[in-house]
Swiss-Prot record:
UniProt keyword list: Ribonucleoprotein, Ribosomal protein
Family designation: Belongs to the bacterial ribosomal protein bL35 family.
Gene Ontology CC: cytosolic large ribosomal subunit
The organism of origin for this protein: Persephonella marina (strain DSM 14350 / EX-H1)
Pfam families, alphabetized: Ribosomal_L35p
Domain of life: Bacteria
The protein's name: Large ribosomal subunit protein bL35
GO terms assigned for molecular function: structural constituent of ribosome
Lineage: Bacteria, Pseudomonadati, Aquificota, Aquificia, Aquificales
A biological-process GO annotation: translation
Entry keyword Repressor: no
Amino acid sequence: MAKVKMKTNKTAAKRFKVTAKGKIKYWKGGVSHYNTKKSSKRKRQGRKADYVPENIADRVKQLIPYQV
């Protein structure tokens, strides 16, 4: 019987990137429109990428098994 491959969750694959050290990087949302009511600090912080917390990283790695 053939071995079954795991499927990559395509929405997660578009939103997360695994770095060389194994951390999972993501880009913050909510800064593409309706920005006039947001403060400059909030918009500036939204431009920076961030890393997934360790307690959630294992669940994200299950969604992107071939990128880990």
